[in-house]
Regions:
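Ankyrin repeat A-helix N-terminal signature
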Residues: 133-139, 163-169
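Short amphipathic alpha-helical segments and helix-helix/interface helices
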Residues: 14-17, 161, 173, 177
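Short acidic, S/G/P-rich loop/turn micro-motifs used as interaction or catalytic elements
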Residues: 7-9, 152-153, 167
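Ankyrin repeat arrays, specifically the small/polar loop and inter-repeat linker segments at the C-terminal end
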Residues: 110-127, 150-159, 171, 180-193
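Ankyrin repeat structural motif
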Residues: 139-147, 169-181
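C-terminal structured domain segments
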Residues: 138, 142-150, 155-162
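Solvent-exposed loop and capping/linker segments of extracellular ligand-binding repeat ectodomains
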Residues: 1-138, 144-147
Length: 193
């Protein structure tokens, strides 16, 4: 979903999201510039009949339901959204939790310092899989962000080059090689005589 509004504006997004249980990305655009991206993970709900009284129990799986409740008066409440991450990082796949962390760090609207540390730690601990996922999805801005944050990690860089070559994503391979060369040039210049 693309919204031409600021993330702090009142929108009807909560009502739209309440009708969609599959994973959905919301991109906020203002003046032709992406100002925020928010991932709402998939969730499922099942009603179990408790017989014979015909009482139903509601079971919800996935953090997507809780994420869709993070609104305050029609505005996205990102502080509340940040509270779902500890459970989401344990229950959701690395790809999904990685996107949540990546988007919150790339677009830090209302991002508290403790949440920033939590998201950064998650990226650091799962960086190879997350950058691989970004390459498979051909998300160049996210690849750039990961390279800027972890350009000193040779293992991640080498792994990213392999994944970019395997997927045939030449733009990513060129970008990663550029970051690697820049890092090597910095090392060489330190020891030049």
């Amino acid at each position: 979903i693309y919204l031409r509004s600021d993330i702090s504006d009142i929108t009807g997004l909560k009502q739209v999201l309440s009708r969609i249980s599959s994973e959905i990305e919301v991109t906020y655009i203002k003046e032709e510039k992406v100002i925020a991206k928010v991932l709402y993970p998939e969730y499922s709900e099942v009603y179990d009949e408790i017989a014979p009284a015909h009482i139903f129990g509601r079971n919800i799986e996935g953090e997507g339901f809780r994420a869709r409740q993070c609104f305050d008066g029609g505005k996205a409440d990102m502080n509340q959204y940040d509270t779902i991450f500890p459970k989401a990082s344990a229950e959701e796949s690395v790809k999904v939790a990685g996107k949540i962390a990546l988007y919150r760090l790339m677009y830090p609207y209302m991002l508290g310092s403790s949440s920033e540390v939590l998201y950064m730690d998650y990226l650091k601990n799962n960086k190879n899989e997350i950058i691989g996922s970004c390459i498979y999805d051909k998300n160049i801005d996210e690849i750039k962000f990961m390279l800027e944050k972890f350009s000193g990690d040779r293992n991640m860089i080498e792994r990213a080059i392999v994944v970019a070559n395997e997927t045939g994503f030449g733009e990513a391979a060129a970008l990663i090689l550029k970051y690697r060369r820049k890092k090597e040039d910095i090392r060489k210049s330190r020891y030049a005589f």
